[in-house]
A protein has these predicted regions:
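Short, small-residue-biased leader/transition segments that mark boundaries at the very start
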Residues: 1-2
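Short acidic/histidine-rich active-site segments
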Residues: 10-39
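Secreted, periplasmic, or luminal enzymes acting at the cell surface/secretory milieu
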Residues: 39-42, 49-51, 55-138, 144-217, ...
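Acidic/polar, compositionally biased interaction segments
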Residues: 173-348, 357, 363-366, 370-377, ...
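Short, acidic/polar linear motifs in exposed loop/turn regions
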Residues: 252, 264, 318, 432, ...
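Short acidic, flexible loop segments centered on an aromatic residue
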Residues: 260-265, 270-272, 521-538, 544-546
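Intrinsically disordered, low-complexity Pro/Gly/Ser/Thr-rich segments with frequent PxxP/GP/PP motifs
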Residues: 538-576
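Short, surface-exposed ligand- or partner-binding patches at beta-edge/loop junctions that are enriched
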Residues: 565-594
């Protein structure tokens, strides 16, 4: 790894992603300094064996130790060896900042006079699986515990509920995995309501010796969130057996569905009767970084108000302890038809649809370009009944939009954090004009994407066949029509671009000056984008590349001169021979636009 010292001037150490250090000697000689997480799996004794067998030099080990100690000294770890608890702040300035960040990241994709909301509306239907419980943050390592969560339904009720009659329906479920047990319906014992009793047994020598117990309630029990961290992580973990138990009292009669999967073996019992066997015959699944078993489900016809004894048995086998336990009771109403009835009764509909942290997370890819479950059907049906429908997309990435031709307004909100609902309410009511721009291209079909022809590859290896044509450059070069291009984003006002002037400055700098005027009636911000096109057409190089942008806030009828400065790197290419950036002389075009496709101004010059 000479590049880290010679090219990057980097004097830190290299750490693996969690569980990614799959080899011993190859990683050691390839520049890895630290395998994570502990305890060591492919290093430790195996690395010592590599040194003893002369496959890894002691000098290599010394260099790794030296780099780790250097960082420890640099961060003053030796002066303060104690592990301090994590901390964060929750105060008014930070809440305001989080709300502003959420607002400015939301992208208005389409608007045919439904937004901002008409203040004279008498009734609004808020429909969709993400309206009451939105996804505010991604799954896996992206997940953080927030101080509070603001969701669209509650935020809109708080903002306009006194003047507008609001009706709500979930419309449909979007589970990838069945939800957590209803905490109000379970109890470990009379003194421990709302939780499972979790018992750990040591099965060595043929017995079941209770070694620890705790009370917990969640659907996903795994080591990365503290499950069994002081028990199964020890050397005796192959002998550990875990039992989850509780009394469950349904509040509805009917077919209940249950689900389990784990890293290891698991089974699900009700009143001693086995409902799910994921123990005797397991298959690989995609959960827990594709280390767990495939999901298995079972059903039971349960009676309202009758108490049942639930027991889940788990035997750890694998990289780290993890098990998922889900339960879905039958719906008390027909959610789909309830939503359609509301759509008939109201002046306007706000639909909040999307994904969740099970669909969009680290460790596995989405398997479908569509919205999960019945959401596309729900959108179509609601719009057919009430064309005055605003669609809010609560997703972390692009989705297929088969209904886009008939929906009038669409907002892409992403996973906007703990102020999500409040930020969305400000956008919808017009307190804030949207100003976000797409950081990626939204394709029409999955077949249009650059990775489609090479994904998923073979034996976990995939070639990046698009080479330099990453992202919007692929669609640009291949002349592929997009649903919404990179950089796209509307406002409640209009902006006029004019007077592009290009000047060469000293130190290989290029000045791009132009004027933007707010020609509408709303105050708003515009993100102008500067693309550079080298006027030499080749099959392998992009048509143009984004090299600068500017965000400008303008009051109605206000105009400002914008200047974007481009440096030498904007006109350079990486030289494999020189191992450095090399300025390419010749003819260039500067394009100024509101997106990668919506180019407003262009000018040519020679460098």
């Amino acid at each position: 790894m000479l590049f880290r010292s010679e090219e990057w001037d980097f004097d830190g150490y290299v750490v693996s992603d969690w569980g990614a250090a799959l080899e011993t000697v190859e990683n050691a000689n390839g520049g890895l300094d630290l395998e994570m997480p502990g305890p060591a799996k492919n290093w430790g004794k195996l690395l010592k064996d590599g040194v003893d067998n002369n496959n890894v030099s002691i000098q290599e080990i010394n260099n790794k130790v030296r780099r780790i100690l250097h960082v420890a000294a640099f961060t003053k770890r030796f002066d303060h060896p104690e592990i301090k608890p994590e901390s964060s702040n929750d105060n008014k300035p930070q809440r305001i900042l989080l709300r502003e960040a959420a607002q400015e990241g939301m992208v208005l994709l389409k608007n045919e006079n439904l937004l901002p909301l008409d203040s004279n509306l008498q009734s609004i239907g808020i429909i969709g699986p993400n309206a009451k419980n939105a996804q505010i943050i991604g799954g896996g390592s992206a997940h953080l515990q927030s101080y509070y969560e603001s969701h669209p339904l509650e935020a809109l009720k708080s903002k306009i509920g006194n003047s507008v009659n609001i009706k709500y329906s979930k419309g449909c479920h979007t589970y990838k995995y069945l939800p957590i047990f209803n905490e109000n319906l379970i109890e470990a014992d009379s003194s421990k309501k709302n939780k499972f009793l979790v018992e750990y047994f040591n099965t060595a020598n043929g017995g079941e010796k209770l070694i620890s117990q705790e009370y917990e309630l969640r659907s996903k029990f795994w080591a990365l969130e503290g499950f069994a961290k002081d028990i199964i992580a020890k050397e005796e973990r192959p002998d550990i057996f875990v039992k989850f138990s509780c009394a469950y009292t349904p509040d509805v009669t009917g077919i209940h569905e249950f689900e389990i999967f784990a890293i290891g073996k698991s089974k699900f019992l009700i009143d001693g009767k086995e409902i799910i066997d994921n123990w005797s015959n397991t298959e690989p699944g995609d959960a827990f970084f594709a280390l767990g078993t495939a999901s298995k489900k079972g059903t039971a016809n349960l009676e309202n108000a009758k108490k049942y004894q639930i027991e889940i048995q788990y035997k750890f086998e694998g990289n780290f302890p993890a098990i998922y336990i889900g339960c879905k009771a039958p719906d008390k109403v027909d959610l789909f038809n309830e939503a359609l009835q509301i759509a008939k009764e109201v002046d306007q509909v706000i639909m909040v649809v999307g994904t969740n942290s099970d669909w969009e997370t680290e460790g596995n890819d989405r398997t479908d370009f569509n919205l999960p479950s019945q959401q596309n059907e729900l959108i179509d049906a609601v719009i057919d009944i009430n064309p005055n429908t605003i669609l809010v997309l609560n997703t972390g990435s692009p989705i297929k939009m088969p209904w886009i031709h008939k929906v009038k307004s669409v907002i892409q909100t992403w996973y906007a954090g703990q102020e999500f609902g409040n930020a969305l309410a400000n956008i919808i009511t017009g307190d804030i004009s949207p100003s976000g721009k797409l950081p990626s291209t939204f394709p029409i079909n999955i077949e249009d994407t650059s990775a489609f022809s090479s994904y998923p590859g073979k034996d976990l290896q995939m070639n990046y066949d698009e080479k330099l044509l990453v992202g919007y450059k692929w669609y640009d070069k291949k002349k592929i029509k997009t649903q919404y291009p990179f950089g796209h984003g509307l406002s409640y006002t209009k902006f006029k671009y004019s007077n592009l002037a290009i000047d060469e400055l000293k130190d290989d700098l290029i000045s791009c000056k132009f004027t933007i005027k707010n020609t509408g009636d709303f105050s708003g911000a515009e993100i102008s984008q500067c693309y550079v096109e080298h006027m030499i057409d080749t099959k392998s190089k992009p048509v143009k590349k984004l090299q600068g942008f500017d965000k400008t806030f303008l009051s109605p009828q206000e105009e400002k001169e914008i200047e974007i400065i481009l440096n030498a790197k904007s006109f350079s290419e990486w030289s494999l021979d020189k191992k450095d950036w090399e300025i390419k002389k010749g003819s260039y075009k500067i394009h100024i636009g509101a997106s990668s496709e919506d180019i407003r101004l262009s000018n040519q010059f020679n460098l």
